[in-house]
Amino acid sequence: PIAGSMVLAAILLKLGGYGIIRMMQILPTTKTDLFLPFMVLALWGAILANLTCLQQTDLKSLIAYSSISHMGLVVAAIIIQTPWGLSGAMALMIAHGFTSSALFCLANTTYERTHTRILILTRGLHNILPMATTWWLLTNLMNIATPPTMNFTSELLIMSALFNWCPTTIIMLGLSMLITASYSLHMFLSTQMGSALTNNQTEPTHSREHLLITLHIIPLVMVSLKPELII
């Protein structure tokens, strides 16, 4: 069920990060050097999840692994225990909550018309559903964290906090973000570009679907314009 996937990616997955933030506040203050193994594990987990995204052929699985990779960055930022790290983690959880939920919604829109989630079989939708292609482009750009979205602000805060703590982490962060851009563009090009494989009659997108995506995009744009609301 797509509603379950949207709630899972947008809310339940982020509750773990929120729980870690609350736990870190009640734990006694310790040197961040003790958290180095967890930091490396979180960043390495983010890279592995990103690499898993690259080899996915199932659209829904790709978006799910994308959510997991972003949570690796969130955990790494929380562990540092700096104001920038916590602000970046909170902002990324909120921003990616909207983004991943919108991506799942778009994946369902595609599935309802093609009856498959295989990337190669869903291509050529830009000729059939041009407005849905626009939504795909916007959400993928937000997933990549292009400015001036909230995703960009949050990842910039996380990168700054991690680089200030240990400059070597920029290698893992840079690799993670490069792979994120690769699979996001791959997902967009695979589902939208090319020629459609089926000649079946496809019904146009409904107003309810546009409304659903708009209700994801508008709060994200508002938070991007006024980040003081959450940072």
UniProtKB/Swiss-Prot annotation:
<dbReference type="GO" id="GO:0031966">
    <property type="term" value="C:mitochondrial membrane"/>
</dbReference>
<comment type="similarity">
    <text>Belongs to the complex I subunit 4 family.</text>
</comment>
<keyword id="KW-0249">Electron transport</keyword>
<feature type="transmembrane region" description="Helical">
    <location>
        <begin position="34"/>
        <end position="54"/>
    </location>
</feature>
<keyword id="KW-0813">Transport</keyword>
<dbReference type="GO" id="GO:0042773">
    <property type="term" value="P:ATP synthesis coupled electron transport"/>
</dbReference>
<keyword id="KW-0830">Ubiquinone</keyword>
<keyword id="KW-0520">NAD</keyword>
<dbReference type="GO" id="GO:0008137">
    <property type="term" value="F:NADH dehydrogenase (ubiquinone) activity"/>
</dbReference>
<comment type="function">
    <text>Core subunit of the mitochondrial membrane respiratory chain NADH dehydrogenase (Complex I) that is believed to belong to the minimal assembly required for catalysis. Complex I functions in the transfer of electrons from NADH to the respiratory chain. The immediate electron acceptor for the enzyme is believed to be ubiquinone.</text>
</comment>
<dbReference type="InterPro" id="IPR003918">
    <property type="entry name" value="NADH_UbQ_OxRdtase"/>
</dbReference>
<keyword id="KW-1133">Transmembrane helix</keyword>
<dbReference type="InterPro" id="IPR001750">
    <property type="entry name" value="ND/Mrp_TM"/>
</dbReference>
<keyword id="KW-0812">Transmembrane</keyword>
<dbReference type="GO" id="GO:0015990">
    <property type="term" value="P:electron transport coupled proton transport"/>
</dbReference>
<feature type="transmembrane region" description="Helical">
    <location>
        <begin position="156"/>
        <end position="176"/>
    </location>
</feature>
<feature type="transmembrane region" description="Helical">
    <location>
        <begin position="1"/>
        <end position="21"/>
    </location>
</feature>
<keyword id="KW-1278">Translocase</keyword>
<keyword id="KW-0496">Mitochondrion</keyword>
<keyword id="KW-0679">Respiratory chain</keyword>
<feature type="transmembrane region" description="Helical">
    <location>
        <begin position="118"/>
        <end position="138"/>
    </location>
</feature>
<feature type="transmembrane region" description="Helical">
    <location>
        <begin position="63"/>
        <end position="85"/>
    </location>
</feature>
<keyword id="KW-0472">Membrane</keyword>
<dbReference type="Pfam" id="PF00361">
    <property type="entry name" value="Proton_antipo_M"/>
</dbReference>
<feature type="transmembrane region" description="Helical">
    <location>
        <begin position="89"/>
        <end position="111"/>
    </location>
</feature>
<protein>
    <recommendedName>
        <fullName>NADH-ubiquinone oxidoreductase chain 4</fullName>
        <ecNumber>7.1.1.2</ecNumber>
    </recommendedName>
</protein>
<dbReference type="GO" id="GO:0048039">
    <property type="term" value="F:ubiquinone binding"/>
</dbReference>
